[in-house]
């Protein structure tokens, strides 16, 4: 029997494991979306699917007679590869997505059910594609219910994020001229040009912020060349900058640094975001990006959730059971404060 063939386990640990055992690598979220839609409907929610692409659908659920909840809990259903099933020990739940972000889905559902017993209605928004391009969030942004606050879940160790760094993905392309490697003077090495361009970018002084920290650069991939005995005519690198403010100056500096060596094309930008905080709660800076910049029509954003980003996407991904339980309490506390 597949995990999606049975009903919700409303214990947060059991529900986390049940969700982890439904493989939902980005692009393959159909099964978990169908499961969440069916089970939330069974619990009495007015659940609907928002088609993002083909059979990939967001799930948005509200309580009957509460189609415009002031507070919406949200996170994503997709995970990075590879899939591995759930397991647990005395203190942790393991498995792909346990931390990022199926433990968060479980915590939000259990919190919503607890709030329901206290006559407090919140919405639930579960999205596809966050790990790839935030497609689900972009689609959802055109279908906002008019909520005032969006409590987005990502692994923050249950601390409120003061800000979330943005992202600037840049593709560098260098071109040269092929020649026999015995006669390099007859060609022009695209790889040499790319390496020089990368050296210049690495030497650039990047901005920093006293509260948020530094803008950072990761050279993620490098490829080029045809054979060891051929002067390469093309080389390419993919870079990712973590933004702490506007990208305008950085874009100009990148273009200037690589001028004459390579072209720099921006393939993705997610803006830096400052977030709403809650008095008295511990805070952190999210050095990663989230769906929040693509959900601008869903109200003032907050970012908080169980789990550590340092174990997300790893071969031993896990979430602490204690943090899952604490997250349920925390989501309830924040929602009550925002609706008081």
List each language-model region with its residue ranges.
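Acidic/histidine-rich catalytic neighborhood of metal-dependent amide-processing enzymes
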Residues: 102, 106-169, 173, 209-210
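Metal-dependent amide/peptide-bond hydrolase catalytic core
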Residues: 49, 155, 162, 169-340
């Amino acid at each position: 029997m597949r995990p999606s063939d049975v009903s919700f386990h409303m214990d947060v640990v059991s529900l986390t494991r049940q969700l982890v055992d439904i493989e939902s690598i980005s692009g393959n979220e159909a099964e978990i979306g169908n499961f969440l839609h069916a089970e939330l409907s069974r619990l009495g929610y007015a659940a609907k699917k928002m088609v993002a692409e083909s059979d990939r659908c967001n799930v948005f659920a509200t309580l009957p007679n509460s189609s415009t909840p002031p507070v919406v809990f949200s996170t994503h259903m997709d995970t990075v590869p590879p899939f591995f099933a759930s397991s647990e020990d005395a203190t942790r739940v393991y498995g792909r997505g346990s931390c990022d972000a199926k433990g968060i889905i479980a915590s939000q559902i259990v919190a919503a059910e607890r709030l329901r017993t206290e006559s407090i209605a919140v919405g639930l928004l579960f999205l596809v594609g966050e790990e790839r391009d935030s497609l689900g969030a972009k689609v959802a942004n055109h279908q906002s219910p008019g909520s005032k606050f969006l409590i987005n879940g990502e692994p923050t160790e249950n601390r409120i994020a003061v800000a979330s760094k943005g992202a600037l993905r840049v593709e560098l392309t260098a071109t040269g001229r092929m020649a026999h490697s015995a006669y390099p003077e007859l060609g022009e090495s695209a790889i040499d040009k790319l390496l020089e361009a990368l050296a210049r970018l690495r030497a650039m002084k990047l901005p920093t912020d006293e509260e948020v920290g530094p803008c950072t650069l990761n050279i993620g991939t490098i490829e080029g060349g045809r054979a060891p005995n051929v002067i390469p005519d093309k080389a390419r690198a993919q870079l990712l900058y973590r933004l702490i403010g506007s990208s305008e100056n950085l874009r100009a500096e990148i273009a200037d640094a690589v001028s004459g060596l390579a072209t720099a094309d921006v393939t993705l930008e997610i803006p830096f975001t400052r977030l709403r905080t809650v008095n008295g709660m511990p805070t952190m800076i999210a050095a990663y990006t989230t769906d929040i910049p693509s959900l601008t029509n869903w109200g003032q954003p907050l970012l908080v959730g169980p789990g550590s980003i340092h174990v997300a996407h790893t071969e031993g991904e896990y979430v602490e059971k204690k943090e899952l339980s604490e997250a349920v309490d925390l989501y309830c506390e924040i929602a009550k404060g925002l609706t008081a």
